[in-house]
Curated annotation (Swiss-Prot):
The protein's name in its UniProt record: Histidine utilization repressor
Positions of the HTH gntR-type domain: 20-88
PANTHER family according to UniProt: MANNOSYL-D-GLYCERATE TRANSPORT/METABOLISM SYSTEM REPRESSOR MNGR-RELATED, TRANSCRIPTIONAL REGULATOR PHNF-RELATED
Cited SUPFAM superfamilies: Chorismate lyase-like (SSF64288), Winged helix' DNA-binding domain (SSF46785)
Superkingdom: Bacteria
Organism: Pseudomonas aeruginosa (strain ATCC 15692 / DSM 22644 / CIP 104116 / JCM 14847 / LMG 12228 / 1C / PRS 101 / PAO1)
Alphabetized GO MF terms: DNA binding; DNA-binding transcription factor activity
Pathway: Amino-acid degradation; L-histidine degradation into L-glutamate [regulation]
NCBIfam families on file: his_ut_repres (TIGR02018)
Length: 250
């Protein structure tokens, strides 16, 4: 397939001439658009069919380029919506506990959240062990999705010792995060983290607006105030939108 420079699409004219696999040339073209600022964060990337039409390459070539750029964290593919330029990855300190709303604000971005569940449950064996309470004792449960500039970046699945925070269910967590409230009523003195790489459940993929099979980063966190367990949380992040960072010295 040949075309003159006058009838090439604007995107096709950005393709490099250096010999390389076609998918690699498509990737480099998209990266150049992002790095130049022509496609800023949240910019909608042309669909596969649009790129096939504009670049003259096969759908398989375009799909591979988009898939690899998503895996690299440069693009975000949202089911039923489209593909968008990703924000630079959010990061959290590996062994510190911070308010996710503050982390997002520190990056100059907007935080909001959606409360999916907020209620009371009876502690079964697993919850009782995690919170150091008796089986059958009441505990509070909240399930919240946190957004950074309207892109879901974390599912916070949290169980709380009701005896420590009896007014937990009365809070408006669209105005302050559970972390912010709990640090007021039961200041953190000790924490425990377990970090895993997992595949999210289908319902979690829907909440995070990711495709099934996308790797996720899971942080299991327990915190104490004095010698009393306050909360046990499961924090799930899309791997393409989050990273952990730590530093140590000897």
């Amino acid at each position: 397939m040949t075309s003159s420079s006058s009838d090439r699409s604007p995107l096709a004219s950005q393709l490099g001439e250096v010999p390389a696999p076609l998918y690699a040339r498509v990737k480099q073209m998209i990266v150049s658009q992002i790095q130049s600022g022509a496609w800023p964060p949240h910019h909608r990337v042309p669909s596969e069919s649009e790129l096939v039409s504009q670049l003259g390459f096969s759908r398989m070539t375009i799909n591979r380029a988009l898939r690899e750029l998503t895996s690299d964290g440069l693009l975000v593919r949202m089911q039923g919506v489209g593909t968008f330029v990703a924000e630079p990855k959010g990061q959290s300190a590996l062994f510190e506990v911070h308010n996710i709303a503050d982390e997002i604000a520190a990056r100059g971005h907007r935080h909001r959240c959606q409360v999916i569940t907020l209620g009371e449950e009876v502690a079964g064996p697993e919850r009782a062990l995690a919170l150091d309470v008796r089986e059958g004792q009441r505990v509070f449960h909240s399930l919240i999705v946190h957004y950074e500039n309207d892109i879901p970046v974390q599912i916070e699945d949290r169980y709380v010792n009701a005896a420590v925070a009896p007014d937990y269910l009365k809070q408006d967590f669209t105005r302050q995060t559970p972390y912010a409230y709990l640090t007021q009523v039961a200041p953190l003195t000790e924490g425990e983290h377990v970090v895993e790489a997992i595949l999210a459940e289908p319902a979690e993929c829907k909440l995070l607006q990711i495709e099934r099979g996308e790797p996720c980063l899971l942080i299991r966190r327990r915190t104490w105030s004095g010698r009393v367990a306050v909360t046990a949380a499961r924090l799930l992040h899309p791997g393409s939108r989050h990273r952990l960072e730590g530093r140590f010295s000897s």
